[in-house]
Amino acid sequence: DVHSAGRNYSILFKNEGDRRVLIAQMKNFGPEGSLYAKVTLTDIPAESMVIATPFDKDKHFYYNQKINCMRAEGTVTYGYHNRTYTFDPADSFAVLDWGRGVWTYKNTWYWGSASGLVDGERFGFNIGYGFGNTSAASENMLFYKGRAHKLSQVIFHIPGDGGRATPDYMRPWTFTSDAGRFEMAYTPVLARA
C-alpha cells in the first residue's frame, strides 16, 4: 500500500491482491472547490507489460509495469455543486502504471496509453518514446482479449519537431510502427482549470 497526506490532501493506493483501490481527497483542487475519489480497479488481465529500460548513463535504469484494460468502478466528486463522475465497470477502464528506478536528471518522455472496448472485446495500447535507451527495449504493446502483443519500433511524429526550437504540441500528431501494426492520428485537447 502507498499512502501520502499533507495539509490539504490525502491519497491512499491499496493493493488488495485481486484489486487496487484508490482513495483521494484534495481541498481547493481548483476554482470550483474540493475533490473526492474512490475508484476500484479489478479484473486484472493475465498479461501486462514489464520492462527494465537502461539509460546510456552508467547505473541508471527504469523498471516499469503497465497493466492495461483493468475495469474501473467508483466515483469522483468535484466542486461546490458536488459534480459526480461515475465509473461503471461494464464500460470504464484504467491503466495501472507502476515504476521504480534510477533516472537521469534531465529527460524527455512521451507516453500514450488507452484502454476500452472494440467490438465488445477489451483492447488497449501502451506506447513510449524518448525515455532511456529504447534500442535495447521498448514499452510498445497492444492488448486484446487479455493477451499482450509486442510492438517493435513506434515512431512519434511530433509536429514541428526537427526544425523548430519548440515543437507545436497542439497540432495533430501521427504515430507509425515499423511493421505497420500500429498507425494512429491524435489531435491534442488542452483543458486547464
What annotation goes with each model-predicted range?
Residues D1-A193:
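Structured soluble/peripheral alpha/beta segments that form catalytic or ligand/cofactor-binding pockets
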